[in-house]
């Protein structure tokens, strides 16, 4: 298994496209297999989605309605509404798997791999990429 860890500075951005970095890693690994992407954080997740057409803003708006940043949450440590951050991985899984053929991600035309992080308390994130060869 080939693996690497990306260090991401979210710097107030809530949806970050990781596709190019994931594709470069898969190309270096080469061959056929599975790319596993994992976020080792309790307040961030991953999504496969279209980007650049307003979908990022739509996702933020929907998540804001589903998980408002107020004091309703039982989980209360951290900043106001931090309990909502701990529910995000229920909607945006901390892991996903993408098939790879001849070193290329087999994503659909408009599909991108995105880090989803609505938590402003921790701008430093890690993302683990692992390539499982089909050999």
Residue ranges and their predicted role:
Residues 1-135:
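Active-site histidine-anchored catalytic micro-motif
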């Amino acid at each position: 298994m080939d693996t690497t860890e990306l260090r991401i500075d979210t710097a107030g951005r809530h949806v970050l496209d990781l596709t190019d970095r994931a594709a470069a890693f898969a190309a270096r690994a080469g061959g056929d297999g599975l790319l596993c992407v994992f976020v080792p954080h309790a307040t961030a997740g991953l999504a496969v989605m279209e980007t650049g057409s307003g979908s990022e803003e739509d996702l933020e708006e929907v998540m804001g309605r589903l998980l408002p940043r107020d004091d309703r949450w039982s989980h209360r440590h951290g900043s106001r509404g931090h309990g909502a951050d701990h529910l995000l991985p229920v909607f945006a899984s901390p892991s996903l798997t993408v098939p790879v053929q001849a070193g290329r991600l087999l994503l659909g035309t408009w599909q991108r791999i995105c880090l989803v992080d609505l938590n402003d308390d921790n701008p430093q994130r890690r993302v683990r990429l692992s390539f499982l060869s089909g050999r």
